């Protein structure tokens, strides 16, 4: 990594970490485009992004665990299902072309822009009803898909999914998401290391920087209105849908 790249990567890493701790994402929404801009191929960028997500998500998760704000049984089921499914999906990523992965990202983000409503989240209660363990296991599989196949943490998918389908309060969904992202990214990173994909040192440098900001923002999650959290999630999803779609189209047009 050259000095110019470093001067760009460090502040963007801090931004990724701040968003990760606040929204329960892994930071891949910033890491992946940054690594593509730095010249990595889509497969290499997505693998390196996964390496960066590990310390980023762990930074937020450690804060939530210290505060004892994650129910242990539900968190364990979510984390284990995310870890195991990421091992599976990380093997499948090699079978797809780079533009296929980017197109899948774009479609996923577009769906998210209409799945969560700020007004519904604002009106929802913070009281926690008994959570369906099977449903949380399914959310963990979604995290594994995002982390293993797409090189994303999956928080932008999991948080709306838990809020809309499982009626999980958005702050708790964000905490669950941070834990699931850490587990799925860890599993996918192990597979990528075995296969020799990505650049671990670059990923850990980005992630280590982001982890500092993730711990800071995660500790302040309760100070942010639920409606604002939902609005931020939707705005990021729309922005990334457009960017991923543009990159997918460029790669598809370059193919012989």
Which residue stretches match the model-derived regions?
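Single transmembrane alpha-helix segments in multi-pass membrane proteins
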Residues: 10, 15-29
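Short hydrophobic/aromatic, small-residue-rich stretches within specific transmembrane helices
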Residues: 49-53, 177-181, 203, 207
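Small-residue hotspots at the loop-to-helix junctions and early N-terminal turns
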Residues: 42-47, 174, 178
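Hydrophobic alpha-helical segments of membrane proteins
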Residues: 149, 182-189
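Transmembrane helix boundary and interhelical junction motifs in multipass membrane proteins
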Residues: 23-31, 151-161
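Transmembrane alpha-helices of multi-pass small-molecule transport proteins
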Residues: 48-63, 112
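Juxtamembrane transmembrane-helix boundary motif
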Residues: 1-16, 34-38, 42-43, 62-146, ...
